[in-house]
């Protein structure tokens, strides 16, 4: 059976992995998931990520990050979904917790944070919010 929303599956695996205090979570890889993982790493929400080929299929491994035994990611939510896409202009991009969190946005220049998209003067699809 095919997956309806692979990004939501990725976010759920990260959320569940941190609740279970796992060091690492694995999932089927894609370019979009890899881009999201890169943004999470650049923003300091995950320790590292990598793509391995298991049985000829790419697998994305994400090393989760904890601070004093608590997960670094407090909230990770999907915003735009297959049934209801959410697009925002540069002026309408959400500020998560007054700028303390990030919104991950898919733009024509790739996947980036809301701050980077605002700096480039671009809007796009709001994939998720992380705090």
UniProtKB/Swiss-Prot annotation:
Claim: Secreted is one of the keywords in the record: no
GO cellular component, one term: ribosome
SUPFAM superfamilies per UniProt: Ribosomal protein S8
Transmembrane segments: none
Entry superkingdom: Bacteria
Family: Belongs to the universal ribosomal protein uS8 family.
SUBUNIT field: Part of the 30S ribosomal subunit. Contacts proteins S5 and S12.
PANTHER family membership: 40S RIBOSOMAL PROTEIN S15A (PTHR11758)
NCBIfam families (alphabetical): PRK00136.1
Protein name: Small ribosomal subunit protein uS8
Origin species: Thioalkalivibrio sulfidiphilus (strain HL-EbGR7)
Lineage: Bacteria, Pseudomonadati, Pseudomonadota, Gammaproteobacteria, Chromatiales
């Amino acid at each position: 059976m095919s997956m309806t929303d692979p990004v939501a599956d990725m976010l759920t695996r990260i959320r569940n992995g941190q609740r279970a205090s796992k060091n690492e979570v694995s999932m089927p890889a894609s370019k979009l998931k890899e881009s999201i993982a890169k943004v999470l790493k650049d923003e300091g929400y995950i320790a590292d990520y990598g793509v391995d080929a298991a049985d000829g299929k790419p697998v994305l491994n994400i090393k989760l990050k904890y601070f004093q035994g608590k997960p670094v990611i407090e909230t990770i939510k999907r915003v735009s979904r297959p049934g209801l896409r959410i697009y925002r202009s540069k002026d309408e991009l959400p500020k998560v917790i007054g700028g303390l969190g990030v919104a991950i946005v898919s733009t024509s220049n790739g996947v980036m944070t809301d701050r980077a998209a605002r700096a480039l003067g671009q809007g796009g699809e709001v994939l998720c919010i992380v705090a």
